[in-house]
């Protein structure tokens, strides 16, 4: 057998694992929120939570976008290019960007910051925890 044909066996194994992978992706991609009208409320809460005197406007926006994408479209933070319809427009308007494409262009660096910088992870985690408490307290989401 030609050594290049070994790829066939690798493909067979990958195809066998695919259904489990798809189930896992489907389950992990379920958003905690779907109603985009909550984004302005999330923005207000995040502004209240963040110490805006200690972080730049840019840093705040990045933390806020991470939290919004995690709540509405978590697969985006894992590299999926598809977001839920309308989220970029809402974020662009709230964050005063000229076009929704600016939101899309920010995603790779937000992902990189989360992966590479512990202080970013901690700050986002703290903000997310406090936002989640408010969401649960308001009955917007039920304990996750």
Where are these regions (language model features)?
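Short, charged recognition helix plus adjacent turn
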Residues: 138-144
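General nucleic-acid-binding
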Residues: 1-45
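Generic structural marker for isolated residues within well-ordered, non-membrane alpha-helices
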Residues: 43, 88-89
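Short, amphipathic alpha-helical "recognition" segments used to contact nucleic acids or chromatin
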Residues: 59-86
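Short Lys/Arg-enriched helix C-cap and helix-to-coil transition segments
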Residues: 114-136
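Short, Lys/Arg-enriched N-terminal segment that forms or immediately precedes the first helix
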Residues: 42-55
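Short, basic interhelical loop/turn and adjoining N-cap
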Residues: 89-106
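Short Cys/His-based metal-binding microdomains
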Residues: 111
